[in-house]
């Protein structure tokens, strides 16, 4: 993978890019979750998928190698959406497929109205909600949830929090998750929590209901943070295959815990889109 950065409104945003892809294939833009980084996508980008498709994975402000946001607003969903759309503009990606994990999925939905020419969207670990009141139904209670919105986090707290990313009893080594969690600017977590609690995000139900592009919802069967029953109640015309796609045995991070299943589903979604430039 190639590492680079761009300036967006004076702020340096780092990103990784797969070394292959192009031709008539779509560009895939990968958006990581809370207290993670672009490197969570490294196995996907370094494998067959990254060799077929041009993949771009950004570090959100305050995460990975990107600079911290200039103010708390940069850690809200609108602030992150501005960073995402700014990156696409700087890299001249006109028709992306946006793939978002957890917070990254919420960002993808926030940005969708700003990306009318996007080819499609894929989210997982990211239930569409219309208001803060719906969060109690969409998200499952978990003892580690508090750390996801805390400025100061110990290594033990980060380890407990990242264990919620995988299925109970999973054999996946969460060391990389822990390192990224501890490297993230604490203000990113508190800023996100404060802004989301105050309702500073768009009506995601209305956004996905109005989409004309295909919109896939993937879900790890053993996700400890997201309520599958809530997801299954959602219906909207753009929903890919008409239902949530469940990955057996995986938790909140199926792209790392069930990489073959995840890549297969994502590849099927890309195939269904057809070549880049195909009229819909």
Q: What is the meaning of each model-derived region?
A:
Residues 100, 104, 108:
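Gly/Ala-rich beta-loop-alpha elbow adjacent to hydrolase catalytic centers
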């Amino acid at each position: 993978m190639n590492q680079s950065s761009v300036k967006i409104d004076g702020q340096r945003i780092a990103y990784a890019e797969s070394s292959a892809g192009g031709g008539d294939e779509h560009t895939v833009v990968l958006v990581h979750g809370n207290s993670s980084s672009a490197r969570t996508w490294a196995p996907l980008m370094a494998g067959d998928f990254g060799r077929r498709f041009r993949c771009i994975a950004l570090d959100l402000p305050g995460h990975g190698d990107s600079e911290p946001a200039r103010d708390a607003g940069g850690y809200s969903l609108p602030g992150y959406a501005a960073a995402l759309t700014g990156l696409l503009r700087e890299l001249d990606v006109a028709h992306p497929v946006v793939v978002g994990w957890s917070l990254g999925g919420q960002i993808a939905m926030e940005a969708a109205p700003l990306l009318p020419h996007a080819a499609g969207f894929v989210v997982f670990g990211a239930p569409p909600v219309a208001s803060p009141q719906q969060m109690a139904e969409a998200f499952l209670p978990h003892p580690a949830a508090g750390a996801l919105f805390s400025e100061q986090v110990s290594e033990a707290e980060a380890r407990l929090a990242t264990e919620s990313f995988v299925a109970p009893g999973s054999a996946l080594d969460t060391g990389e998750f822990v390192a990224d969690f501890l490297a993230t600017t604490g203000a990113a977590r508190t800023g996100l929590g404060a802004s989301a609690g105050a309702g500073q995000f768009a009506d995601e139900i209305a956004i996905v209901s109005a989409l004309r592009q295909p919109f896939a919802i993937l879900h790890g069967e053993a996700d400890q943070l997201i309520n599958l029953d809530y997801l299954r109640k959602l219906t909207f015309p753009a929903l890919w295959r008409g239902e949530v796609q469940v990955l057996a045995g995986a938790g909140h991070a199926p792209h790392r815990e069930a990489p073959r299943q995840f890549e297969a589903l994502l590849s099927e979604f890309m195939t269904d889109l057809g070549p880049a430039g195909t009229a819909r």
